[in-house]
Amino acid sequence: KTNTWDTSDLTYSLYELNLEYKGGPVTYAIGKIKPRITGEYRTSSSAILTIERSMLVNQLRSETNYGFQVNNSDKKDKLGWAAGVWLNGNGGTGTGTFNNRIEPAFNSRDNCFITGTLSYDTSNDVFLKKSRLWLDYAHNFTKWGDDAQNKAYEKLTGYGFKSKYQGTGARDVVALTWEGSEGDFSLMTEVMAGFNVIGMKAGAENVFGVTVMPSYKFTPHWEGVVRYQMAAGSNAVKWEKRYTQNSTYSGTSDCMQALYLGVNYYIFECSPNMAKIMAGIEYAHSNGTDASRQKGFTGWSYNIAFRTNF
């Protein structure tokens, strides 16, 4: 097939590489950057409290992309903001399907998406001493259609090379996040939605979800975390591919709910995220069947991880 969102598999890639200039109250950045929308995705992978982010966050987020971003320089501003424009496809010629971090072939027909964020400091205004409210929005300008065989990304007319799709999981993504902490206790709550979800058959247009994640630092080394997540949308919820998803179950469902219990051990008190051991147990339940009458996964998953950052 020609002119599809597809690319060759290479053994090298850049995850992030950018130039940043702080011009007083405004900071400018250009290069390959992670578009930071939704609370869990805004958090670095080295600092997340669970072994994997929530399912709907992973479904709606984009990969790192080449783009341009501006934002307020001081993270302590009462009102914060950010805006960016990003490429949708990275890649060169080829026919492979695995690597999604290939460097870009710059072409205006690659199309793009935009992101915007507003945040407001709610510290001392609610029940936690330090807190912030975030509103994220992303809009994707790419035109796509239904393609059940390779899960989306209709042929692009006149497109001279293939490219792996890197953009958002829906044409429009909205997320409202509130994060707060007081002492050793932290809480993150998030509601999000994706409108016109890509890669699904007709009728699976929209998806909605909520995440609630409290955590508590018992000692400088030991931390406990609980997460409840729910995602719903008519045959539009995409399951994880790395952990809970099993080939004997459908990759989509109408509704998913999951409860995660985890414990993290930080090896170095002075730099907690430099090296840590994470253990988590999660029960997930799905409702509905896909077009082939296959059910999604319902059951337990157990994971242990050693994560480093240096």
Positions of PLM-derived features:
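Short alpha-helical interface elements
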Residues: 44, 51, 55-58, 95, ...
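General secondary-structure edge motif
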Residues: 50-51, 98, 158
